[in-house]
Amino acid sequence: METLDLPVERFAAISGPNLSKQIADREPAATVVACADIDNARTIATACTTDYFRAFVTRDVIGLEMCGSLKNVVALAVGMARGAGYGENTAAMIETRGLAELTALGEAAGADPKTFAGLAGVGDLIATCGSPLSRNYTFGSNLGKGLSVEEATKVSNGVAEGVPTADAVVALGKQYGVPTPLATAMSHVLSDGISCAQMLSELFGESISEE
């Protein structure tokens, strides 16, 4: 926006639990359109809505964009745990604590925390963390099976956005004074090659606190 020198009302973002293959197959799904001008958001949502695809609207552009990018780090961690053989309890812990981490970070950046509880947040997280169609989940799964980052990159179908995003989450956390234990642990996986067990050990290394 700053580069193009255009008002924020001219920009919109779309995000949600939208695995592209399932949308192409016309399976029922929904998304969220965010724009500072809610009328513009409604115009775009109307253009996107079909008998199998529903669009909702919000003014929270910051929250929606953060949900769409930061959840990929959580998907990497869940995929890694599943690839290493851990079950639903572990996956649910990572997803839930990851969502709490991202919500706190989003709120510190000026986002509406309710966005993280909606389609763009928890909805997208469920889809991304539970499907082999998700590049980030698949990439993480390959790491959990013992592949290196380089090997996982070679066998992955497309770019796993969570790989470069992990360090960005850690940096944002430092900027806003928000702890990011999950993103920090995944950053160590990607940069130092620590195992899934070590990654989980870092998460459990946190001091006892209220949920």
Predicted regions, residues:
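Rossmann-fold dinucleotide-binding core
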Residues: 1-87
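Hydrophobic alpha-helical packing residues
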Residues: 44, 48, 101-106, 169
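Short, well-structured alpha-helical segments that form the helix of a local strand-helix-strand
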Residues: 45, 95-99, 152-153, 200-201
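Short, structured loop/turn "capping" segments at alpha-beta junctions
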Residues: 54-57, 87-91, 106-116
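NAD(P)-dependent Rossmann-like dehydrogenase/reductase catalytic/cofactor-binding core
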Residues: 71, 75-82, 107-117, 121-211
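Ligand/cofactor pocket segment of small-molecule handling proteins
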Residues: 89-92, 96, 102
